[in-house]
A protein has these predicted regions:
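Active-site glycine- and acidic-residue-rich loops that bind
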Residues: 127, 181-189, 222-231
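Sequence/structural signature of outer-membrane beta-barrel proteins
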Residues: 27-34, 66-70, 100, 156-160, ...
């Protein structure tokens, strides 16, 4: 299932309850736009290191450190702890991946055969999106189905959605390093996903994300209206014999000042 994706990774070396792994993703590209090309280009897009440890019978820790485009961007993409009450109720806290669609959770390069990431996951859903927070997730298995749920409160996206160098609305610009230290408005964002899977058919999931993105008060004084960003997504994986078909659709709504 999509939910368990962060634990289904290429771990290469294990010792006791701890495992270390990772992957590197390099591309050679030749692009042409309107008959014009800049020739051949090569890049080391990502170099990722994973660390996992089962601390005890109920506690699991996992993390991911990513080097993107060489050392242009270095990010701690995941660093979370799971406390397993039972498989149907797991408490999670740390730097986590909000479950908006399937790709934001299962985005590792070795899983896919394509060079570029899906447009819906970069132009609408700002994958890869990591946020600090906590919540619960779990899995149930009634009558041959596997049902899963995730629900988290996180710091959320920031004012870069509207105030950015692109001069337009851009959800990816709402990501900033400051969001790992504090929430810019003190109102956590809510993200949630529910999904159903049948082993011989596939999986379908429905996701929701909503949070206030602007700083609407200063020193306790309200200085602006609250403005929120909302995302809805549906993801589908259909297994037809040896073929697996995957798709994802998303819609975003952003509240902006009346002057815009």
């Amino acid at each position: 299932m999509v939910q368990g994706g962060i634990y289904q990774r290429p771990f290469l070396v294990s010792a006791g309850r701890t495992a270390v792994g990772g992957y590197a993703e390099g591309h050679a590209e030749y692009a042409k736009t309107d008959g014009v090309t800049e020739g051949l280009s090569m890049a080391l897009r990502r170099f990722n290191i994973f660390l996992f440890s089962s601390v005890g019978r109920r506690i699991r820790f996992t993390s991911e450190l990513e080097f993107e485009n060489g050392t242009e961007e270095i990010a701690l993409e995941t660093a979370l702890v799971d406390f397993v009450v039972n498989p149907s109720f797991v408490i999670r806290a740390g730097i986590l991946l909000p479950p908006i669609g399937a790709f934001n959770v299962n985005h590792d390069g070795p899983r896919y055969d394509f060079v570029e990431r899906p447009l819906v996951s970069t132009q609408i859903i700002p994958a890869t999106l990591s946020e600090v927070g906590g919540g619960v997730h779990g899995r149930l298995a009634p009558r041959g189905l596997s049902l899963s749920y995730d629900a988290y409160l996180t710091n959320g996206l920031g004012e870069g959605i509207l105030l950015n160098s692109l001069g337009r609305l851009d959800l990816a610009s709402g990501k900033s390093e400051e969001r790992f230290a504090e929430d810019n408005n003190g109102e956590p964002a809510l993200s949630a996903r529910v999904a159903a899977q049948r082993r011989d058919l596939g999986e379908i999931g429905f996701s929701f994300y909503r949070g206030t993105y602007n700083s609407f008060r200063t020193d306790g004084v309200v200085v602006d209206d609250k403005r929120a960003v909302s995302l809805l997504a549906v993801d589908l994986r259909a297994d037809v014999g040896p073929v697996s078909l995957q798709g994802e659709a998303a819609a975003a709504a952003v509240e902006v000042p009346e002057s815009l």
